[in-house]
Amino acid sequence: MLQPRENPRLYGHAAAEAAFARAAASGRLPHAWLLTGPPGIGKATLAYRLARRVLSGNRPAEDPNDPSSAVFRRVAHGSEPDLFVLETEANRRTGKQRHEIVVEQARGLTAGLHETAVGRHGRVVVVDAADHLNTSTVNALLKLIEEPPAGVVVLLVCHAPGRIPRTIVSRCVRLALRPLDEATFRRAVAAAGVDADPDPALVTLARGAPGRLLRLTEADFLAHYATTLEALGGSRQALSGAADQLAGVAASSGSDLATELLTTIVRRGAEQATRGPLEPALVAVEASHLAALTGRQPLDRWLGMWDKLQRLPFELDQLHVDPRQAFYLALAELAGEERGHAAV
């Protein structure tokens, strides 16, 4: 799968790209932009398209989004000297991938921006994603946005703007991207090399975001969902096995995706309890297993689990909670068991 910096195609967001182009053509391009929308809909791909436009000037001799163009190749290969990217990196000491953008990265960025630009058309900072900034990094980035060096454009990708400080949001021009309509979604999925007729259950879960469908497919989400549902109707040993599985998903595909296996059960269980069986079912066993689960405890308690699960990725990534134990306790509560039993 192409990374956003390598992707020449953009689906469904022509209006947002055109708005940026008009601002650039006016000669009064705002220096800070916030690209918002659900994960997987193309925000980072758009950010790199906009970056290539800035780096090539307002009237380039060649299309900067043509893979054969010089600026496209430099951006794709990470060799464009006037492009600065803030994203999560591996911890140099431990080798493990960090889950936040740390202040040392922001300081390195600031130092680089005070050097003379290599090209003639300005410099670009891409932050992918602003959701991963910690408090210290937010403060450093805010200073950059408030007092930008001449010719610098900052493009912030953001999945949930309500979770980042208003001081940053208020200083940016916002491009709000929407989920793709079905026809555009299918074109984007086909272009990415995925089955032209993907599983309807995955399409339902993707919610108009091609990148999300790719991620769910690669993580084998539906298979894990089925085994998690079945384990919730089984013994403590079954729950323990499911906790091992979820810890494995967290390690390979991210704690957010592992937690989503549980939040999907909560959300769809609550919907089924109030509206009846859901179509399409995500897996064959879904309706009967959800009915059994929601029948064991009051619906308000079931819904109360949602808030707890929303905090779980943070606890796993930032507080370094033991994932197997955390997932076991969450599974036990969903199954209607008393809290406090350690994983077996």
Regions found by a protein language model. Name each.
Residues 18-24, 69, 73, 100-124, ...:
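Conserved alpha-helical scaffold flanking the Walker A/P-loop in AAA+ ATPase domains
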